[in-house]
Curated annotation (Swiss-Prot):
Protein name: Cysteine--tRNA ligase
Keywords tagged on the record: Aminoacyl-tRNA synthetase, ATP-binding, Cytoplasm, Ligase, Metal-binding, Nucleotide-binding, Protein biosynthesis, Zinc
Residue window of motif 'KMSKS' region: 270-274
Domain of life: Bacteria
Alphabetized CDD domains for the sequence: CysRS_core (cd00672)
Catalytic activity as recorded in UniProt: tRNA(Cys) + L-cysteine + ATP = L-cysteinyl-tRNA(Cys) + AMP + diphosphate
Cellular compartments per GO CC: cytosol
Keyword Translocase: no
Source organism of this protein record: Leptospira borgpetersenii serovar Hardjo-bovis (strain JB197)
Enzyme Commission designation: 6.1.1.16
Taxonomic lineage: Bacteria, Pseudomonadati, Spirochaetota, Spirochaetia, Leptospirales
Amino acid sequence: MIEIQFYNSLSGKKEKFSPANPHRVTVYSCGPTVYNFAHIGNLRAFLFVDVLRRSLKLLGYGVDMTMNITDIDDKIIRDSIASQKSIQEFTTPWTEAFFEDLKTVSAEFLEHYPKATESIPEMIQIIQRLQNQGLVYEKDENLYFSIQKFEGYGKLSKIDTSGMKTGTRYDTDEYDKEDVRDFVLWKSPKRKGEASWKTSVGTGRPGWHLECSAMIRKIYGSGVDIHTGGVDLLFPHHENEIAQSEGAFPEESFVRTWLHSEHLLVEGQKMSKSKGNFYTLRDLVGQGLDPKAIRFLLISAHYRSKLNFSTDRIAEASANIRKIQNCLDRLLDIAQNVKIDPSYSFNDELTLRWKKEFEESLADDLNVSKALAVVFESLKTINAFLDSKKNRVAEISANEFIQILAYYDRIFGVLNFESQKDPLIDSEIDSLIQERQTARKNKDFARSDAIRDQLLAQGILIEDTKDGIRWRRK
């Protein structure tokens, strides 16, 4: 088990990660609001959770992770009423689409995906405890949290509530940091067809912020080691979660470490439908983009840095995957019967150093970009070694290199470890290359170019090197 340093949004600095139980690190992540397809900004946040999960496991920790499904909020109620469907009928297809998107980008599935509507009793329990603490008041049949009565309000977002006018409040779920007001815990129905529950605190439905506090309590009993989400959720959502949970259960620790992933830009601009740069994963796949390249790009930058999504960056991601895969394919041609072993013990001094540097990069606040530098340094060395030996290396050496690439891919999840070698196809390619060489000797450049184009159309690239002609698959 390797010591990890995380940047904790609560303290504003890197800290040694000290989970209550390293063999069961508890993690809660804010998931999708299922009223439409997730956009690629959402996807970056979801893939950050995937990198966190994979990194914790690779560094020796056990995990118990949750991502919620928000299946009741203002937007869902608005759109379900417009479509004349029940909440469940409306949200089920969007929930299924979310899981399909996760599969498309090879995200590992978590232990829990609770729906907000499944935790109404836990929400009522929190409200009742807050009422007992004197932190709740009623107005127009809605229940509100009085933030001025909670001493610790603002400790995550570092806002100052001293200038807030007493009794000002918000009924909507989302609002700006510059306009702090009391937030709603429980809303009475205002429109015909609006979903509601009959409870001991009144007929209504939960405010968005209450939902996550309740789901954490239902699954974990108290608090969690790590809570993640996009930086846009830091205020008001996560600040309000703290207020509710610590207000209701002041004797308990709610969250030890807060991790927030930064915004995604598209072609250097904030994503917006009005700008025409708003994309879902399905939009991009429909345009012919490789899901592996999308995944690789979205996880390649440090999670606390803004990431620019562009056609050039996607092309770069595709090229980088090809570089790694081409090196792997060369090795698989040598050691065709290799089995990937997650518990493999590296023997070579070089691979041991790469493994250590890769782990240290991830343990440094999930520094994936630094880890990638280790990957490409090792690729350069492996390819140079294979070139110097003209691919005539022992299977044991090839296997060592294959295992280190597999180790890297436990984070990136983009490689194919099935051998691409097919003797029949290879012999045909070799025959065509020999024919091309003959054509070039005879100065039949038209025939030479035609063979090159024929091979290229089949995904075969020819490289003229000082050691002779080498070919590889794209």
